[in-house]
Amino acid sequence: MNQRRRSHTVRMALGEFELIERFFTRPVQRAVLGVGDDCAVLAPAPGMQLCVSSDMLVEGRHFLSTVAPQRLGHKALAVNLSDLAACGAEPLAFTLALALPRADEVFLQGFADGLWALAERHGIELVGGDTTAGPLNICITAIGQVPAGQALMRSGARPGDELWVSGTLGDARAALEGFRGTLDLPGMPLAALRRALELPEPRVVLGQRLR
């Protein structure tokens, strides 16, 4: 393996069902039916509406080939949780579609560790998905719930409203461009910005408080 560039391709050692069972199956408590059937079954609380968001991450465009698997698992879920937060939704469940060049067990364990750690923090359950062979590609669909009529929407802004920003704008993009070499950044600031690119923090609680 080239030490200057971590490869996510090692060897095909697992079949699809074993891969799902080992890394992406856990008991569900909030979903009626989770991983293992043709569809998941969810039961939102009375008086709630569902919010659904999907995001795809592609190697080289959304994350670096050198990213640690744990950080990639975190980021894949975090970007979807951020969309739920933007609507003020409470996270419920998510699905994961994962294309892999090879079933690298070390990569999969790290990816799953990062994914599950964030999922447990926000009480969101993995209820389904798909795996296939192909270039590394990750797609998560997250589902949340919000009291009927209370979802935060972009169309809700009016002239004269205050605009509040949490966090720092542009850090993740600056890090990505810096590592690509398209933005000239010194080493220390670039290393500091890398956390924003690889470990974004979804503002789930803040989103619910803003409803």
Model regions and ranges:
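Helix-biased detector of long, well-ordered alpha-helical tracts
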Residues: 1-211
